[in-house]
Design a protein with these regions (language model features):
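Mg2+-dependent prenyl diphosphate-binding active-site environment of isoprenoid biosynthetic enzymes
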Residues: 23, 61-71, 87, 95, ...
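C-terminal binding/interaction regions
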Residues: 87-170
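Glycine/serine-rich anion-binding loops at beta->alpha junctions
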Residues: 19, 47-66
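Polybasic, low-complexity association/targeting segments
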Residues: 1-16
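Phosphate-handling active-site elements
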Residues: 32-42, 68-89
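An acidic intrinsically disordered interaction segment
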Residues: 19-36, 108-111
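Acidic-glycine-rich active-site phosphate/pyrophosphate-binding loop
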Residues: 1, 28-46, 115-117
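Short glycine/serine- and small hydrophobic-enriched flexible loop segments
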Residues: 27-31, 66-73, 142-146
């Protein structure tokens, strides 16, 4: 288990439940990729639960998309090229995520309509988020970190030998 996965677990599984999926993913990726203000999760606050509990795209993916954009903007001087490369990384991430979990939509992944009355509370009480959502965060952090390293935008930390999720066959 990598340091990044341990950090994600520390944040996501904390009893205070202070950070959601998108926030944890953004924080951990910002730390892993050496981005400034790594502890700032505020851009991802409303992205948890598939964007404001709407059940849309998984917060782990949207948090990773924010990190990918920040990273591309830091590494590539040309704004158009940075956007293209950030999109490419996120598209690869989403393809692998879909192959691994069957969907990228929170509603399908969780089986809950988190925006409906009582559903978020039921989702939290059921506790499967501690396993299922955690696995999705772990996959996303590992995969985007790997893709960033492949692109030459990040180096593996000393002593960190990550288990890289497989790339799905195309």
């Amino acid at each position: 288990m990598t340091d990044h996965v341990l950090r994600a677990r520390e944040l996501f599984l904390d009893d205070t439940n202070a950070y959601g999926c998108a926030e944890v993913t953004l924080i951990v990726l910002q730390e892993a990729l050496g981005l400034p203000d790594a502890g700032d999760s505020s851009p991802a606050m409303a992205l948890n639960g598939g964007i404001a509990y709407s059940g849309g795209t998984c917060g782990a993916i949207t948090g990773a998309a924010l990190a990918a954009g920040r990273l591309a903007g830091r590494c590539l001087a040309d704004h158009s090229e940075a956007k293209r490369e950030a999109r490419r990384l996120v598209q690869e991430l989403m393809a692998g995520f879909r192959a691994e979990f069957g969907s990228v939509d929170c509603r399908h992944l969780t089986g809950y309509d988190l925006d409906a009355p009582g559903q978020h509370e039921a989702f939290i009480a059921d506790g499967t988020w501690r396993v299922n959502c955690m696995r999705q965060i772990e996959y996303t952090v590992g995969r985007l970190t790997h893709l960033a390293r492949e692109a030459g935008w990040a180096s593996p930390p000393a002593g960190d030998s990550p288990t890289v999720p497989p790339v799905p066959a195309r």
